[in-house]
């Protein structure tokens, strides 16, 4: 919903159904090509994509970009929105916002979010989001596949290195992969870029602000 609110501010142009096929950079000129062979020219490029999509879009990534960004990996995760409480802990007094159910034999685990608590839902009916369930839930409302960043020593080192080349070739990078993989990390990385571009954000920063970025 926050995306709709941002769009409704009408502070910028945006394009839908315009899949990007290639991005070229030459002599401080940035050209974005879409699948319909339309070319858009810009002075500054901000990648607000998954990290593993960047190198596929850039026509000629720099040596630093290729070396750093290739360390970011992603995994596909199946998610269900449902009302099946059998994917929650057996005893309700142990339910929490995040619930892990493990399978020792398979060395895997299932994560179920209790949305009523996470989102403070005004209802007595319980709603859950389960990632990679060991059994398909009943009472399914919706299902989708998410791509989530995989964290490793290499990816954490790459976070710091990518922040050090922000602005090179008039190119910037933001996304949750620069923090801990949450929406808040994506927002904070975009705020960081806004400040590099001397653009203020429309809210005040708390005094004891916690920096989630590397």
Task: Give residue spans per PLM region.
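Conserved flavin/dinucleotide-binding core of flavoenzymes
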Residues: 108-214
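General small-molecule cofactor/ligand-binding pocket signal
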Residues: 13-15, 40, 172
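Helix-loop-beta segment of a Rossmann-like dinucleotide-binding subdomain
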Residues: 1-5, 9
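Conserved beta-strand termini and adjacent loop/short-helix elements that scaffold enzyme active sites
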Residues: 17-19, 35, 174
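A conserved beta-strand/loop element that lines the FAD pocket in flavoprotein oxidoreductases
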Residues: 9-20
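Short, well-ordered alpha-helix to beta-strand connector turns
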Residues: 10-11, 42-43, 168-169
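Mid-domain catalytic core of redox enzymes
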Residues: 21-151
């Amino acid at each position: 919903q926050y995306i709709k609110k941002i769009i409704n501010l009408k502070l910028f142009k945006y394009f839908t159904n315009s899949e990007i096929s290639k991005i070229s950079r030459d002599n401080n000129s940035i050209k974005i090509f879409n699948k319909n062979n339309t070319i858009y020219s810009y002075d500054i490029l901000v990648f607000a994509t998954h990290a593993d999509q960047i190198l596929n879009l850039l026509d000629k990534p720099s040596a630093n970009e290729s070396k750093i960004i290739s360390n970011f990996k992603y995994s596909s995760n199946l998610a269900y929105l449902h009302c099946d409480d059998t994917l929650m802990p057996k005893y309700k007094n142990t339910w929490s916002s995040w619930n892990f159910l493990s399978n020792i034999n398979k060395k895997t685990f299932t994560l179920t979010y209790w949305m009523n608590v996470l989102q403070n839902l005004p209802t007595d009916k319980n709603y859950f989001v389960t990632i990679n369930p060991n059994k398909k839930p009943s009472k399914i409302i919706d299902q989708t596949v998410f791509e989530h960043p995989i964290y490793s020593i290499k990816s954490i080192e790459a976070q710091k290195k990518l922040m050090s080349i922000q602005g090179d070739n008039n190119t910037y990078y933001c996304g949750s992969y620069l923090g801990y993989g949450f929406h808040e990390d994506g927002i904070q990385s975009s705020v960081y870029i806004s400040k590099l571009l001397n653009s203020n954000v429309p809210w005040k920063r708390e005094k004891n602000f916690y920096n989630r970025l590397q």
